[in-house]
Amino acid sequence: MTQATRFDRIAPFLDGQAIEVPSWAYGNSGTRFKVFGSAGTPRTVEEKIADAAAVHRFTGLAPAVALHIPWDKVDDYAALRRYAEDLGIRLGTVNSNTFQDDDYKLGALTHTDPKIRQKAIDHHFECLDVMDATGSRDLKIWLAEGTNYPGQGDLRGRQDRLAESLATIYERVGEEQRLVLEYKFFEPAFYHTDVPDWGTSYAHVAALGERAFVCLDTGHHAPGTNIEFIVAQLLRLGKLGSFDFNSRFYADDDLIVGAADPYQLFRILFEVIRGGGFGPEATADVAFMLDQCHNIEKKIPGQIRSVLNVQEMTARALLVDRDALTAAQEAGDVLLANEIFMDAFYTDVRPLLAAWREERGLPADPMRAYLASGYQEQIEADRIGGTQAGWN
């Protein structure tokens, strides 16, 4: 079978791929030392949405943009929804924020003070109200909660309070909505984090019910973690709800997905396909999303590169000859099984993807098309004055 014939067989699955982009990727970001401004950075959520729509226009891969509350707070979310739809995209996941208020210094959903816990719960109720207006499905919760020193907090008590708070929030989740709980092994807390790993997240969402899932951020693991195994396990348990794709060299670097280890991205996507999260045997509804900060590079090209990286590794993962791989595995042929796996990884699908795009009225090279479009120069000329959006 020729490479082109093999690609033709997987092309229909690529047609359905959607990678949600985060609104905050278009704003300024940085490290704990410095946030750098950049020309053309959005000043409003509408300008963020316009930039997200540009990514979708050139790639056909990003039909939704995630919101972050309160960073993207507006008076009229129904109008914001119409604005996005007029640009050809929709409003996606709503992300809560309980890490930038002084009241949450020692915890939010885990705090010992019931008034502060209720304040954090009420914020999530606000996010659910936003979802009702925007038509969003997923409420994503990442908690920057934990302790820095042994003895600082009651580990068991914090888990109990977290479970109670999540249960209260979950009661307000609609029948067509989902709660996804993200984990991160450290930072900003350094001794212990309240949701540090997939097991803790799974324990909480399993207790909540069938509309609660785990969000897996690829940068939120200790170095050397076998992330694809976690993917396989969560799909097996029916609790993988979404991805936050990014890349890392050391910690939670939030770099362009696939930049540090494209082979890892390939392995992850293979397990997504193998486990029914995407592709010919899909049974689970797993949302693909980026969570990245373009601290020094231009934001829109960074997002274009990111969604293309996910698409390319998805195509390669779909090309794995599953029948031959299974036969080699069952025969105990270690080297042949690895060879079959690596053959797919080393397949250069870029020319095939370029042709695939042209057949669908998209530019063969989205990055070159964007750079030649004049959009970047236009926003840099137009967005003068005002306060640039950013997470600080």
Placement of each model-derived feature along the sequence:
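Structural recognition of alpha->loop->beta junctions
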Residues: T168, T200-R211, L235-G238, N309-D323
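Hydrophobic faces of well-ordered beta-strands that scaffold small-molecule active sites
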Residues: Q17-S23, T31, P63-L67, I89-S96, ...
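Gly/Pro-rich active-site loop or hairpin
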Residues: R32, F36-R43, Y191-G199, H221-L308, ...
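A structural motif corresponding to the C-terminal end of an alpha-helix
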Residues: A54-A62, V130-G135, T168-L179, A207-A212, ...
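Active-site beta-loop-alpha junctions enriched in small/polar residues
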Residues: W24-Y26, H68-D72, S96-F99, A144-G146, ...
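Active-site acidic/histidine proton-transfer and metal-coordination neighborhood
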Residues: Q3-F13, R90-L91, D103-G209, F213, ...
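N-terminal pre-domain/capping segments
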Residues: M1-D132, M313-N392
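Generic structural signal for well-ordered alpha-helices
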Residues: F7, I49-A53, Y77-A84, H124-D129, ...
